[in-house]
Regions:
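ATP-grasp fold ATP-binding core
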Residues: 1-15, 38-47
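Broad gene-expression machinery/nucleic-acid interaction feature
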Residues: 1-3, 50-52, 121, 133
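Short small-residue beta-strand/loop micro-motif enriched in glycine and branched aliphatics
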Residues: 13-14, 88-91, 144-148
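Phosphate-binding site of ATP-dependent enzymes
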Residues: 21-102, 126, 132
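ATP-dependent carboxylate activation and anion-phosphoryl transfer catalytic cores
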Residues: 97-175
Length: 175
């Protein structure tokens, strides 16, 4: 049913992502997504709070970054929200302990199941205290204003320390 999201399977910065509210918007949305990727996803639109959790395993140690809530002026965390100041990121997100525990457990499980390496960001929608997995960002932004560096700073980790961990972990031979 509608609304739903149409998005390219392999793209970044929300290029080609459309929130479809009417049947007439569906075909143009699919065409826009195919312009960015050979495969297109259609996802149920879940109303709730958009959050993101960074994670990495380095030197055998698990790093779960503080959760960030994404408060957007647009309908979702699109290009304008990400890069043109139409969003506010709140780190750490104001979530109850039970929700934080669920998100952290789901984040770590997804990281391991998908055999991720280095630092990734995993996005969720939280509705009525229940997190719904949305996607994995395997190449998250790393500018000083990006979410992962904000999360690292919130846990007392400098950009230099973060990059040292990433370089150390990703330079090791893959199993």
């Amino acid at each position: 049913g509608l609304p739903l999201f149409v998005k390219p399977n392999a793209s970044g910065s929300s290029f080609g992502v459309t929130k479809v509210k009417t049947r007439e918007q569906l075909l143009p949305a699919v065409e826009a997504a195919f312009a960015e990727s050979d495969h297109v996803l259609m996802e149920e639109c879940i109303d709730g709070r958009e959050i993101s959790c960074g994670v990495m395993i380095a030197g055998g140690k698990e790093y779960l970054f503080p959760i960030t809530e994404l408060v957007c002026q647009s309908e979702f965390f699109d290009y304008k929200a990400k890069y043109q100041g139409f969003s506010k990121e709140i780190t750490p997100a104001d979530l109850d302990e039970r929700t934080v525990e669920k998100v952290n457990a789901m984040t770590l499980a997804a990281y391991k199941k998908l055999n991720c390496r280095g630092v990734v960001r995993i996005d969720f929608i939280v509705r009525d205290g229940e997190p719904y997995f949305i996607e994995v960002n395997t190449i998250p932004g790393m500018s000083a204003h990006s979410i992962i560096p904000q999360q690292a700073a919130a846990m007392g980790m400098s950009m230099s320390e973060l990059f040292d961990l990433i370089i150390e972990e990703t330079s090791q031979a893959q199993p």
